[in-house]
Amino acid sequence: MPSKTICDQVIPPNVRDRVQELDGDLNDGLITEKGYVKKKSKILFEHLSPDIQTKLKGLEDELKDEELTEKGYLNKVQSILAKFIETCSPVNGDTKEEASSNGKDDEKAESTVANGTTSNGSTTNGSSGSSKANGHTNGGYVQSSSQEETGTSQSEEEMDMDTPTSGKGGSKKKKKSKGSGGGDAGKGRKRKVLGDDERDGVEKKEGEKKDVEGEEGEEAKEESATPDEKTLRTSKRKRSPKADAKQPSIMSMFTKKPAKKEEEKMEESSSMEVDKKEMENGDNGKKEEEEPSGPGGKRIKKEEEEEEKAKVEPMSPSRDLRHKANHETAESKQPPLRCKECRQLLDDPDLKIFPGDPEDAREEYITLTDPRLSLLTGDEGDAMSYDERLQHKITNFCVYDKSTHICAFDRGMIEKNKELYFSGYVKPIYDDNPSTEGGIPTKRIGPINEWYTTGFDGGHKALIGFSTAFAEYIVMSPSEEYKPFWTAVQEKIYMSKILIEFLQNNVDPVYEDLLTQIETTVPPEGCNRFTEDSLLRHAQFVVEQVESYDDAADRDEVLLITMPCMRDLIKLAGVTLGKRRAARKAAAVKKDKKPVFTMATVTPLVSHIFDAIFKDQIADEMKAAASERKKRCGVCEICQAPDCGKCTACKDMIKFGGSGKAKQACKDRRCPNMAVQEADENDIDEMDNSSNKENKDEKKAKKGRKLETPLKKKKRAKVTWLDEPTEVTEERAYYKAAMLDDEKIEIGDCVLIHPDDPTKPLFMARVIYMWQESQGEMMFHAQWFVYGSETVLGETSDPLEVFPIDECQDTYLGSVNAKCTVIYKAPPNDWSMIGGIDDPETDHVIKEDDGKTFFYQKWYDPELARFEDYEVLMAPDDIPAHRFCSCCLKNERAQEKETARPGAKLEDQDDSSKVLYSSWHYKGNEFQIGDGVYLLPEVFSFNIKQKVVTKKPVSKKDVDEDLYPENYRKSSEYVKGSNLECPEPFRIGKIISIYTTKSNSTVRLRVNKMYRPEDTHKGRTAAYQADLNVLYWSEEEAVTELEVVQGKCSVVCAEDLNVSTDEYSAGGPHKFYFREAYDSERKCFEDPPSKSRSTRMKGKGKGKGKGKAKGKIAVEKEEEKESTETPFNKLKCLDVFAGCGGLSEGFHQAGICESSWAIEKEEPAAQAYRLNNPGSTVFSDDCNELLRLVMQGEKTSRTGQKLPQKGDVELLCGGPPCQGFSGMNRFNSREYSKFKNSLISSYLSYCDYYRPRFFLLENVRNFVSYKKNMVLKLALRCLIRMGYQCTFGILQAGQYGVPQTRRRAIILAAAPGEKLPFYPEPLHVFSSRACSLSVMIGEKKIESNNQWCLSAPYRTITVRDTMSDLPTINNGAQKLEISYDGEPQSDFQKKIRGNQYQPILRDHICKDMSSLVAARMKHIPLAPGSDWRDLPNIPVTLKDGTTCRKLRYTHKDKKNGKSSTGALRGVCSCAEGDACDPSDRQFSTLIPWCLPHTGNRHNNWAGLYGRLEWDGFFSTTVTNPEPMGKQGRVLHPEQHRVVSVRECARSQGFPDTYRFFGSILDKHRQIGNAVPPPMAAAIGMEIKVCLQTKTKRDQERAALEPVKEETEESMD
């Protein structure tokens, strides 16, 4: 294909308009010359010929290679582009048929009008019939004649809203006009003026749809084009081209134009006179209008209607296919036309035109001289010298632009130098009557220079003022036409007030909380109910007000803009931060202090630790901050603004005469983008995208290993033995003491050792025993200590505290540097009663630091970050004391536990090649014949192959992109909340035999395959309806190795039980039963064979291996064993920050405690706790106040409730809020004070004062990573200092039986002498994406103690399991008590309903969403994975009678291109790479405008308005179900509503009998903030194990005491 020549090139109308706007920006000084040339080149590049494109690329290369200066480059590019514009051809130079054949789209093909004339010989509306056409066509640029100096007519150059005209199809090719030929072509033609019915059609609201709007818009766009030379000439004027004098009013379009003579006279006059003339024409246009008369006018109209009908005829199929094939080369659809002044869409049915002023309306300057407005009597003298500006009020006002389009004054047009005027009745400033009575009708006041707001401080009514060149006007009531615009302004101002007060009064509020506040606020008079749509509509203004408020913040103060709710609002609405609107005067916002919470009650111990840690750190951080400049985005207006020269930072700058030491940026240039980004970086999403595929068996380091530490071999001093060896072997001689220079070292001493790396600190070790090798090397066995800084405590540790670890090594005596002292600090006998003492340092064992004295009190596990009591092991009888090492003994025991050990061999050896056993010991379990075992899913498979559930991809070709324009965004197959990637649960087998072969020592198990319901031919449906622990016996067998066995479980026949299956299942998590056998070949169920009912296979063993009994006897023995569990006394629990009691409920289910006391400040949550724990004392007071009273010796609270005293509390649990800090990685001095005064410090002080036996702190997963782990380290440091054993971990609630991803950080602590609990193993499989539970502490990765990382005993719990049995309800259902529809359908439902005497379903109620939100929910499909991207783009009548609009796509999308039908995909100018334009915003659309606006930057907002999947799970916590909230999918899978309170409660694992209190939002918040009871119950079961172990150990010690006394007496 031959390349296009210059003369063949076409500039489309939309590109022409963009060039014109760019020219105007250059003339106004809004853009630099460099930016102008670059943007102009970018706009025109695709329309240039290949030769010119190559030439421009060559110039770029020369500029990069520095062969060309930047100025020379810009000049050459500008010259090339100007030449191109001069010589380009018209866009409609071809006929309709030729355009079509060349692949042009229909709209361009039908553009046949040239030179402002129609095919019937009439000129277009508003154009002159003179010859001054300047060679300009309605489609684009043509070569201009140098003789023509005047511009085009008004409608051609300035107006984007000319009435389009059409040819009849244009069967003949139009000739391009040259020189003044364009004017000649227009001579003698009739001017078209609108008839009555046409004029009425312009002004009336849209009552019917017009199919030809798009076509008319295209031609209207093509009829207004301006040569580049004209733009350059007009740039010499004082006023910008955008505000040119030739811009007419809307009424002037309908008036008869002056004669040719008058026009020529006008053009010869000055530009200021033209302005005045146009203003007069605009105001008096109605008087000058003339109606078309005679048949000529009607004929013109009839011909045009016929042509419009021809336009909208559908294309033939063949043409349609051709059109699709060529859509890449032809522009399918162009952006709709906009008014150049107000930027409103010209075909918008809501576009309103100013109806005009009253006949007696005056000019502004005349009105201002009216004596009725004067406040003076004439005797004041020089009073006016003090008040330079007049101030009045105006009522019944209306704001409009130069085109008389009624428009909003708050959309940024004033800032863009657009002239806005207003009319109304001016009244004196003291007149508060909003009626027009007594007002002076005034027309065309302005233009408006600025607008401002007042009344932010305390008042409910916000006042708004306009400022013109002559006066200021406080606005009162709008006219009827302007009411919708005025209501929107009132909304946004009042909403700003609500938002700022909300941010002041709440700590770290989330977006859903903000929505609740907005939606529940009573709007001011005249405003509609506040909704999420109105919040998003006004987001830019509201955020700017918050930015203005933040301007008064101190440098290290947390900005309100960084609050979670504000960050989400900014992302959703696509707010541009850092805008500084020069022409809008915002009212000064009073900087109110946030409400001061009660000062934290902190014990001296906690306070001392905080002060000691932060004393040096804050100083270091301040130095670091001084040398570190604030980061900037470099894009926002704040970053690009100059320094103010007045603030403290500026005064320190060298350029302002300062020292330059601080190196801080101007206070007015605090970049909001970077502040928001830092806060975002500190957040960790609940759903981790990384899969947890690490296997514990692949850990490099095992617990109890010997450490190989690189040490210096070279002798540092002379070493000699001091005595004779205590034992001599062939290779070694053991000694008790040695002399190192002048220091004597004995067994049990501690020494400092030189590391091989001199940059590392000296190692510390205890000398366990010493010897000399046969080769002469003098050695000792070292048991290592680690410094506190080497543990998870890091920099928060006590510098004198060390921790022994289970690592030891043979070391050279010559590497010892010196002897040191390490003292064991034992807990005092009255440890539990000395909490909260005034001087916590009295128990310090080191009185003076000499650099070589240290102490220890806890043992440390580096792999799991556990601090435990140091336990000394006694030497076994077979190991001599002089070479006994407790670490080595622990190593051996750990190794034995990991190594399989055989039990008794069976006498009946059926196969000579095998050795049969009755049992084997492995990982602490004894596996016997007849036991059930857990196996990984890959160990064996079943004969029934289940259909793999995969999401069926929807072909994009099957989607109607015009109806579903956002569906193309659904490119990813992954759906958040889906279980498609969920692993399978363990396979379960029942051991038939255990054996090894004589040729191979590998232990093998032969097992019966036990089928789960989902493994049978019935599939998942059967699993959903069956108990979780039901199995089916099968005759199928599998052979596996003992090493792959994951655990042990109980598998019994239901007929062998002497209790019900429900009672049996309630006895523990690892109990399974079967009633039937399954035959996979015949796909049928049958009675199990008799051999399956034998709990132990018969066989005679050797030695102790005896045959086991059959049937109920063995089951009864197991039950008898369980019934002899060690009893223990339940703990007395204090639940701080109790909420509605999720933690307490879980501990009740575990049976470990009694909820004696609870503290909850929020009254609704406290009432809920009382309802569910009637025997508990619930305090609704501030926890700080209560602790202060107790520490002061008070016995009762202010309300007379009895306070717990020292020694009363045995279990302390709670989740203190960790809020109010910035997103920075470290504390600053202000935040340190804030943290010291936080609820975390209060909660730790509760622990210090009461010294309970067990302590639990629950928080969000982010808690462990916050501030570079500093918050976690401080909490652990305080617990260690108190004397507690402690650890931390991350748990996933979904792994304990709830259909929800909820990762939580849990700190556990146990008092000295107690056993520190481990974290519970997962019970249910869950999405691997959400199960990353490791934590990075510095460069160290801390793992969970869980062994079941790849699978778990039970399948995952789904949404279907949770709530499929609940009755159908509608949006806004409010009936608190209803009946169940039927019986429970799943095991989860059966358990969650409990044993109610009269089953009543409570709280199955849901939020009443607004009409628009309800319509959106109704149109979300029911298919899995559906969300907002599946919404149709249609107008819908809402339940309140209003109609939501169709979303309009007005811009090209650089990233996503066009649809398959050629439709645009951008809804804002930012889609094209430009700045956001406020006029692009759309509201009340079924597809929320904000989502496609910012979707490209935020993963297409996947999940908003998303439905839950029946087979999926809830995404994170739902504290307030909002379809556009951050909390994931909240729409019911099948019903058009958000999830109900009871459904949320079930997702957390609360029983149906559990009560909540308060409003529907209170109940949602109580549920969402609670700890899931199933997870709390799993933790409680681990605490229960520790209690039983401790009780059993105490009983054994008590039993040994009499024996010991008797032995001592006998010796005496």
UniProtKB/Swiss-Prot annotation:
Residues 115-131, 143-154 have a biased composition (Low complexity). Zn(2+) 2 binds at C644, C647, C650, C666. Residues 678-688 have a biased composition (Acidic residues). Pfam families: BAH, DMAP_binding, DNA_methylase, DNMT1-RFD, zf-CXXC. InterPro entries: BAH_dom (IPR001025), BAH_sf (IPR043151), C5-Methyltransferase (IPR050390), C5_DNA_meth_AS (IPR018117), C5_MeTfrase (IPR001525), C5_meth_CS (IPR031303), Cytosine_MeTrfase1_RFD (IPR022702), DMAP1-bd (IPR010506). The keyword Repeat applies. The gene is DNMT. The lineage of its organism: Eukaryota, Metazoa, Echinodermata, Eleutherozoa, Echinozoa. This is DNA (cytosine-5)-methyltransferase PliMCI. A zinc finger (CXXC-type) spans 626-672. It comes from Paracentrotus lividus. Its EC number is 2.1.1.37. SMART domains: BAH, DMAP_binding. Residues 132-142 have a biased composition (Polar residues). One of its GO terms (biological process) is DNA methylation-dependent constitutive heterochromatin formation. Residues 743-871, 967-1089 form the BAH domain. It is found in: Nucleus. Belongs to the class I-like SAM-binding methyltransferase superfamily. C5-methyltransferase family. The keyword Endoplasmic reticulum does not apply. Coiled coil: none annotated.
